[in-house]
């Protein structure tokens, strides 16, 4: 049953790429989706680019364990500072200016905005160099999660995901990416709800889960003497918590894969 679902998912992803190929006839269509991507697809594309492997591996595993219930502040910060404000402040401005300058990428935007070929080249090098470890971390997290869930070899997961992604992106361009992000975003939302429900059910409900969490020792944290630190308002390590909120919320304002979503919106 699990194998059948997995195969169906892979076929669906590739099928979306083939379907979108018919609507991709120019470079503008391939890179920007013809600047015609609607609000729902754009929102899910932004969200799945923002919260990829980190939502299940980083937030749930690392931050959840380090900060307890206070890690909820990270989600709130990401939603307001990392998602809402960029759209309000950068969204329209970036869309209008990138259209006016006829730029399809961030390096191209900088080059034409400041009439500087050097800035275009330098920004392209920066994007290329620093997106390599970023992309590697995403594939690493997803492959480990996938491997544990389906008992598949890690190396096979990495190669398989890279090949599948390459196929639908190369074949269908950005429209295929946006449509796949929409589908995968729905799957992620369902998965998050299912994980939370299963966790609370296994602990006897929300109140009992919080009660059990309050008895976990904070030894090894910044406040080892704080009783019930994992259920406190700011957690056992508020300074590092604030740092994580700022880093994960404001850092997205300049990520090329996030800003690129503004280039593609229809209106």
Question: Which positions does each model-derived feature cover?
Answer:
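Small-residue-rich segments of transmembrane alpha-helices in multi-pass membrane proteins
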Residues: 39-46, 111-116, 184-198
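Transmembrane helix-loop boundary segments of multi-pass membrane transporters
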Residues: 2, 61-77, 139-155, 175-184
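Membrane-interface helix-loop-helix modules in multi-pass membrane proteins
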Residues: 31-102, 235-251, 258-260, 264-267
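Membrane-interface "cap" regions at the ends of multi-pass membrane proteins
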Residues: 1-58, 169-172, 194
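Hydrophobic, small-residue-rich membrane helices and short re-entrant helix-turn-helix hairpins
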Residues: 27, 102-114, 173-183, 254-267
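Alpha-helical transmembrane segments and their helix-start/interface "positive-inside/aromatic belt" motifs
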Residues: 31-35, 178-191
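Helix-loop-helix module between adjacent transmembrane segments
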Residues: 74-169, 243-251, 260
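Hydrophobic alpha-helical segments and their helix-loop junctions in multi-pass secondary transporters
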Residues: 16, 20-23, 131, 135-139, ...
